[in-house]
Amino acid sequence: EWKLFRRDFARYYEREVYPATLARTFDPYLARGHLDLPEFGFRVNINLSADIAGIDRPEGSESETDALVAFTRKFSEGATLFHSTREKSLVRQEVAAALKQFNEQFLLPSRSRREALLKQIEEGSQVQEAPRDILTVLLANRADQDLDDDMILREVAFFMQAGSHSSANALTHGFHEIDQWCRRHPEDRSRIMADDHFLQACVHESLRLHPASPVAWRTASEAFLLPDGTSVAEGESVVIDLMSANLEEPLFGSDAEHFNPHRRVADRIPPFGLSFGIGIHT
């Protein structure tokens, strides 16, 4: 899948796919004359995630989005099962049922269309390019990567969950921080509208203050020493305090706890802190 996420891929989605998806999701709210930002954030991100994942929505309807939202929220319960206060066996059953329904309603039709296209391309009878999405990449490489149907289902479903839930929250936090900043600093309002780099700085600053998770849990695959000399045995859990790291005053200044899109940090420090962790995501 990493082959997808290159500059030309991002440019293609930014210019070709996202505008149409945003417009389609916006239309019902424009007709009503109002929107709830968290709800809109979830719905627009679920559609953007579906585009990248390779989930077709032939009707382009609100009911299709409703179904995807319901499935994805249930997948989120499975992804955060460790923290659930509900009976875990019941949550597992519900997630399994949601996966089955998602597979039948969305994945199988999307997969059938892509398999037919890939076959036609292989035979030379199709001039249309294969869709540029995760499902197509998985299907095209399933033999080389030994991917079975269950693995493909889980991979696509997890991407749908990961690509929508935290992004919707980030949109809401970012909008709130920018709105509050402009109330205090009205001179920056026009700059946000005209300067993409400044808008990006606003988003990075909000992500630093509002990581998707305040901590990251890892299990040691072998024994090692932490930089301070603490010994960690194989199999022990290591908790990384992302929130505290993002508020380190030596790195982000004496006002680290506050939103400041004009903040300057050293080149080696990501402006969004450890909100995305460090290293390759697998």
Annotate the PLM regions.
Residues 191-230:
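Conserved cytochrome P450 K-helix E-x-x-R motif and the immediately C-terminal K′/meander segment
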Residues 241-267, 276:
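Conserved cytochrome P450 K-helix/beta-meander segment immediately N-terminal to the heme-binding cysteine loop
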Residues 153-190, 282:
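Cytochrome P450 catalytic-core helices
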